Amino acid sequence: MMSTDKFLVPGNEEQKISSVVFEAPMSEAKSTAEQNQLYERQPWQKLVLIFLAELFGTAFLMFFGCMGLVPKYPGGELGEYSGAIAFAGIVAVTIVIIGRISDCHINPCVTLCALLLGKLPILTAIIYFVAEVLGAIIGYGILVVISPYNILNSPDSGVCVTSPVVGLTAWQALLIEAITTGVLILLVCSVWDPKSGNGDCGSLKFLVMIFLTSVVVGPFTGNSLNPARSLAPAIYNNSWNMHWIYWVGPFSGTITSTLFYKYIIMALDNEERVK
């Protein structure tokens, strides 16, 4: 049986999640150690918190992000930056809400990065992955339910579906998604790196990153950078044209950037790195 002490909350593994508790005085028969246990969460409780945080976080991402791409009426035009603002904004807000619980991955690529960096054991990474996929499906599903049928529920609506623009080849789209996701993952690694000096204002950094890539890359590939984000709309709209691009591209970019940061940037002499 695998030891449960391998299941750690990301970030500071020693950090305890505490709360204010009001209760009657303890019996003197209870030892100090027994009292302290009341304020500590067991490993399985940490995993449940992580699962729920990622589930709700990814659902928020899909619900609010994709809502920014829903027209007011069939065939209606969207604001030029409505999708970029919606996705960038909800990413920043979600980081603030669940960041202290799960590091706010809400993206299987970020979870893969954490796994490759040694921040997560593989079973915990699987829990992240399942929560992210389910959360994306639930979040987009709620959006489908509350939207007018003639706008989002029609078979050909295609709202929030990621697909390459006409004229872009599969390999071009693949490279765009790989490179852009790679840049995102370099930012993730930098924020997690204790010697980079970039641990503060993480939500603002990712807000700028998502907004920038949405504006620049969105017109070409939809700026997925997240397999779960592309999977949910594909399921509901039964749209699988070149869908593989949004798995192979982001994951290949993630692996390349994570290994580059781990074995090249982090391997530099400590004196040459920002303290």
Predicted features and spans:
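Membrane-interface helix-loop junctions and terminal tails of multi-pass membrane proteins
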Residues: M2-K275
